[in-house]
A protein has these predicted regions:
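Short, acidic/polar N-cap/turn motifs at the starts of alpha helices
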Residues: 9-12, 49, 118
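Conserved NTP phosphate-binding and transfer environment spanning the P-loop NTPase/kinase superfamily
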Residues: 97-182
Length: 182
């Protein structure tokens, strides 16, 4: 099967066996988020440039060989992760299952607060779920990414927090009105 290839500026991390493509403008904190996730036991596939290959209906990412296993942290420099954390914190390629786009938080910027419908982003003809996360000083973007992955996995099992609250509200309204909500 022919591979369709492209590349993007970002980082690819495996979180709970789920490939997370971190996107956002230069300097937003993608590499710092990746470092936080690595320190929590997750695995780096690529930092800075992510090569993307389509294999059937799946996407697989990797780093260009020259920068494979490196993480660039402003103020520290280039970190070669196998030397610092051991070979278990890196992988030469991994799946891309979820896109987390980091955007600067500021007054007036709106973020999804219900999560009923997941936005999508296309890469190499494959539609991926997209979560837009606020990156702000002293914020824990890594925690938001982990929560996004857990939510993604829960959605794959057929349930969302929005559906739970909707069911609870419908039940409450039915109880108060004496009949089911239509």
């Amino acid at each position: 099967m022919e591979e369709i290839k492209t590349q993007t500026h970002g980082a690819l991390i495996e979180v709970l066996d789920t490939g997370v493509l971190l996107l956002g403008r230069s300097g937003i904190g993608k590499s710092e988020c990746a470092l936080d996730l690595i320190q929590r036991g997750h695995v780096l596939v690529a930092d800075d440039r992510v090569k993307i290959a389509r294999r059937g209906d799946r996407l697989v990412g990797s780093a260009p060989e020259m920068i494979r296993y490196f993480l660039e942290i402003r103020g520290i420099g280039l970190l070669y992760l196998p030397d610092l954390y051991g070979p278990e914190v890196v992988r030469s390629e991994g799946p891309i299952d979820l896109v987390c786009r980091l955007v600067e938080w500021s007054e007036g910027v709106t973020f999804d607060r219900i999560g009923a419908q997941r936005a999508r982003e296309m890469f190499a003809g494959v539609s991926l779920p997209l979560v837009t996360l606020p990156a702000r000083p002293a914020g824990s973007v890594a925690t938001l990414v982990e929560a996004s992955v857990r939510d993604h996995l829960q959605r794959a099992r057929g349930a969302t927090g929005a559906e739970r609250i909707d069911a609870a509200l419908r039940a409450l309204q039915a109880e108060r009105s004496g009949g089911p909500l239509r």
